[in-house]
């Protein structure tokens, strides 16, 4: 049995804890608020500010974990190097977590060091620099904070008149006090995918069937598997994913995102060194092993005999229309649970914000079925659940 310190206790962490419990592991779930989803299924829990390096060190010394598994990005990530030097396994590695937290570090690694195809980009430390970069890149363009998550601070800028708002919005959405943004060429893509990639301690890099997804404001709204893409494009994406994960080092599951263009091919977008929100579709039984089980096996060094597509699947999120500190209630469960070949997952978040992700609907069908129809079904059913 390993003692695992989980940093971040959202819905992805909750599913990881469930997988870990089924393998007899001991989990300490941490977050900045009490009653977070993963805490509800963990052995122990801690509530503290994970951006506070001293507090993070205190918790690590208190529990002396064998493994630290970051589940979110709002962590004092540079401290992970120290824990790794002390002999604690950081997942997938301290290097990976630090690089992927910073869009500057990961983009320069991908584009300049590894030669992966990406959108053209510049950095801006002031509004003037942002205006200069936009003039070079042209409109529309995408502006993002160097450090943020779930689309925070991200905007699509269609004209010079919108740049001042994009600058303020980006800085306000940035982690900490960093006032530097990345401005990117807008790629006219036909689709975007997540390629769940598994790096192992003792074994080859493995890939899950590609997952298509739709985002709004940089945040996941629906996903489906398998995404139908050109085999040559899939091979190109797999090669890029293997290159970047090998450079970042470590064992675990990664969510590697790509833009696909029929005209211009495959563009590397970004990656997360952990299970991915779009990968929740694997909870519909689309694969023999879902993304959380794969992450756990890679972390523990357990064998993964292979990844097989068992059936097709689609997911659609359930969002809160309200903000309240009261525990949320849900209408429509009877209707949803009466649907065939459908799972409902309520995450158990103790309070709501407007557009906060509160649950997900998962639909499945045999291989070869109509995937577009399944996507429509998942969205239709998700709309039946009312958060109040």
UniProtKB/Swiss-Prot annotation:
This is Formate-dependent phosphoribosylglycinamide formyltransferase. PANTHER family: FORMATE-DEPENDENT PHOSPHORIBOSYLGLYCINAMIDE FORMYLTRANSFERASE. The gene is purT. Belongs to the PurK/PurT family. The keyword Phosphoprotein does not apply. The keyword Ligase applies. It catalyses: N(1)-(5-phospho-beta-D-ribosyl)glycinamide + formate + ATP = N(2)-formyl-N(1)-(5-phospho-beta-D-ribosyl)glycinamide + ADP + phosphate + H(+). Keywords: ATP-binding, Ligase, Magnesium, Metal-binding, Nucleotide-binding, Purine biosynthesis. Mg(2+) binds at residues 257, 270. One of its GO terms (molecular function) is phosphoribosylglycinamide formyltransferase activity. ATP binds at residues 103, 144, 149-154, 184-187, 192. Involved in the de novo purine biosynthesis. Catalyzes the transfer of formate to 5-phospho-ribosyl-glycinamide (GAR), producing 5-phospho-ribosyl-N-formylglycinamide (FGAR). Formate is provided by PurU via hydrolysis of 10-formyl-tetrahydrofolate. GO terms for cellular component: cytosol. Residues 108-300 form the ATP-grasp domain. It comes from Bacteroides fragilis (strain YCH46). Its EC number is 6.3.1.21. It comes from the Bacteria. One of its GO terms (biological process) is 'de novo' IMP biosynthetic process. N(1)-(5-phospho-beta-D-ribosyl)glycinamide binds at residues 11-12, 71, 277, 349, 356-357.
């Amino acid at each position: 049995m390993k003692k695992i310190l989980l940093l971040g206790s959202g819905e992805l962490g909750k599913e990881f804890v469930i997988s870990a419990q089924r393998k007899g592991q001991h989990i300490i779930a941490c977050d900045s608020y009490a009653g977070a989803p993963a805490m509800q299924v963990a052995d122990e829990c801690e509530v503290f500010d994970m951006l506070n390096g001293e507090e993070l060190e205190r918790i690590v010394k208190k529990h002396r974990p064998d493994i630290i598994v970051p589940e979110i990005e709002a962590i004092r990530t540079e401290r992970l190097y120290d824990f790794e030097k002390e002999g604690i396994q950081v997942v997938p590695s301290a290097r990976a977590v630090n690089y992927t937290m910073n869009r500057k570090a990961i983009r320069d690694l991908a584009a300049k060091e590894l030669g992966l195809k990406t959108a053209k980009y510049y950095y801006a430390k002031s509004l003037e620099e942002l205006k200069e970069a936009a003039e070079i890149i042209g409109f529309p363009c995408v502006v993002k904070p160097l450090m943020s998550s779930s689309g925070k601070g991200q905007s699509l800028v269609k004209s010079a008149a919108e740049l001042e708002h994009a600058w303020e919005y980006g800085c306000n959405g940035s982690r900490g006090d960093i006032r530097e943004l990345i401005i990117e060429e807008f790629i006219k893509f036909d689709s975007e995918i997540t390629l769940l990639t598994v790096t192992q301690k003792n074994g080859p890099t493995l890939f899950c069937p590609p997952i298509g997804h739709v985002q709004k404001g940089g945040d996941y709204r629906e996903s489906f598997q398998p995404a139908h893409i050109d085999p040559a494009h899939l091979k190109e994406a797999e090669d890029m994913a293997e290159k970047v994960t090998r450079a970042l080092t470590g064992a675990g599951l990664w969510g590697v995102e790509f833009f696909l263009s029929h005209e211009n091919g495959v563009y590397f977008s970004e990656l997360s060194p952990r299970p991915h929100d779009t990968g929740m579709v694997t909870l519909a039984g689309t694969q023999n092993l879902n993304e959380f089980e794969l992450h756990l096996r890679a972390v523990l060094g357990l064998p993964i005999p292979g990844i097989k597509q068992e059936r097709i699947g689609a997911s659609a999120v359930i969002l809160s229309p309200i903000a309240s500190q009261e525990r949320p209630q849900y209408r429509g469960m009877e209707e949803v649970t009466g649907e065939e070949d459908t799972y409902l997952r309520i995450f158990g978040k103790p309070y709501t914000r407007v557009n906060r992700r509160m649950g997900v609907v998962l639909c499945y069908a045999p291989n070869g079925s109509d995937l577009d129809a399944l996507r429509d079904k998942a969205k239709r059913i998700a709309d039946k659940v009312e958060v109040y």
